[in-house]
A protein has these predicted regions:
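A solvent-exposed interaction/effector surface
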Residues: 4-141
Length: 141
């Protein structure tokens, strides 16, 4: 099991503590403003470990598995997924006692299909976690 703890300081910086981090790479990087496109759900802070994987399975796995077999979009939603690499990012946006959990991609312009939203982060320092292999496996085990 991997435990990730985020702490936000009063200077809008955060610290990350990871246990069993040998399966993930952590890199700090300054990023210019970035805008993402995707879809999200509201999750209570104490339910993230259970609800985040469920959201991926339901919203991404079940709905778009055919798309990733053919790589031929059949509608505006599938086109947006391919053009913006939706699924490349999992974003967590604090919303008080809950957080918005996003399945997202970097917005490259164009139309925003119904059910999708845009979210922009100001320029700041980022903590980037990456892994090779099946997506979400490090968070689920």
């Amino acid at each position: 099991m991997i435990t990730i703890t985020f702490s936000l300081t009063n200077q809008n910086k955060f610290f990350v503590k990871i246990k069993k981090a040998d399966v993930m790479k952590l890199e700090y990087k300054y990023q210019k403003e970035m805008t993402f496109i995707g879809y999200y759900t509201e999750i209570k802070m104490n339910e993230g470990y259970e609800k985040c994987p469920e959201f991926w399975d339901k919203e991404y796995g079940e709905k778009y598995s055919k798309l990733f077999t053919t790589m031929i979009p059949e509608n505006d939603v599938e086109r947006a997924i391919l053009e913006n690499n939706i699924g490349m990012y999992a974003l967590c946006v604090d919303n008080g006692g809950e957080f918005q959990y996003w399945i997202a991609g970097e917005y490259k312009g164009g139309s925003v299909p119904d059910g999708f939203s845009l979210y922009s982060f100001p320029e700041s320092e980022w903590a980037l976690f990456s892994t090779k292999g099946p997506s979400l496996l490090p968070f689920r085990n």
